[in-house]
Amino acid sequence: MKRLLGLLLAMMVMMGGMAGAQASTDNASMQLIRMNPLAFRKEPVGLYSVTHTPNGSFVVIYFAEGEKTELQEMWMELFDSVGTSLLSAKLGEFDPNGEQIPHGQIILKKDRFICEYYPDITSMEVCTQTVYRYTGKRIQKPTTKKLKFGAAPYAQHVGDYMVEKQAHSEDETPFRTVKITHIASGKSKKLMIYDWSFCACSDQDGNLLIGQQNEKGNLEIRSYNAAMQESIVELSGDFLQNSYISDAACIGQTVYFDIYLTNQQSEILFYDMKQQNITDSQTLHTANDNSYIAEIKAAGAVLLSVDGYWNRELQRQKYQINLLNEHFETSRLPLQHESCLYIFTDVEQADVTTIEMDEKSHSYFVCSYSISAGE
């Protein structure tokens, strides 16, 4: 089952004295650009997802305690780029010890976004949709519809695109229906993907890249531009035996494919887009045995790995950011707070945005950093 970096989040308000504070390691320096407190409508007991929008705002879906002690609520909240709350809405309530667990997700459009709420993630046969502007104005009231089993997608924001993956299937066909959409133009394409754990990333030219192990067992790399023009490269998949493509990141003309080996170890393949071939590989390890490799990320020309681990005391998933040198040795990047709950990087600039929590006060912050590799 594909490792999920369960995007957890909370964010922002400027704390002027902090900007310019700098920390460094032997291999990297990280400078805090800004840190803003994040005031939620209700105190989160867990962050479910964070989605960045085209205008720099972001949408957080989170869990909060319900009015009745045995229930929890799922909320959606929109924040602008400096952490001001523009919109908050209760999506639904549920029994955390019950059989039905909800799912909420955001689908981005050019000038609006759709908030979807499914009361039961195991079937996703009932969906309530509400449409908002990025300013927070609601432009369509909630509408509830029933879906056939297998019709609902999981939505993922990847660069300039939305990737909607078929969530469930009872069909005999092994292929998964996937819809990709260029957010700004609205152009879309429907794909049939064999590998249910395929990965997607964006390159610095604004293209969408999809890596999968196809029905022949080979590594298949697909590329799509804004006009939905497709190119496909197929390479030997001998290295994929008893494994799968867990993640991918792109820097310049090189795509780094994360091939899962164990929770603490991956093989990173270097794919040269010009040569259309694998040119190198390196082994990636977690910093310690108590964590797992959550994902790899590109921040400008800097390649990062993210380790995830479970904080038993706080009952929350937390993350650690590592800079990778040319030998794939890791250097932990220092953050302002011990609990990092969400990480977003810019593929064009060496910037990292995090959602962090102060463990004593349970206050949330959105922090922006610039990263540079050391000498």
Language-model features: where?
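Short beta-strand elements that form the blades of beta-propeller/WD-repeat-like
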Residues: 56-65, 105-122, 155-170, 206-213, ...
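Blade-level signature of beta-propeller repeat domains, shared across WD40, Kelch, NHL, RCC1
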Residues: 341-375
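Beta-strand-rich domains and repeat architectures in extracellular enzymes and scaffolds
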Residues: 39-71
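Positively charged n-region of N-terminal signal peptides that target proteins for export
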Residues: 1-6
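Repeated scaffold domains used in trafficking and secretory/extracellular systems
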Residues: 43-52, 96-109, 146-159, 193-204, ...
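Surface-exposed loop/turn elements that mediate protein-protein interactions on large endomembrane-trafficking
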Residues: 24-42, 71-94, 121-148, 172-192, ...
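Bacterial N-terminal signal peptides
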Residues: 8-16
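Solenoidal tandem-repeat scaffolds enriched in leucines and small polar residues
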Residues: 154-158, 163-179, 190-221
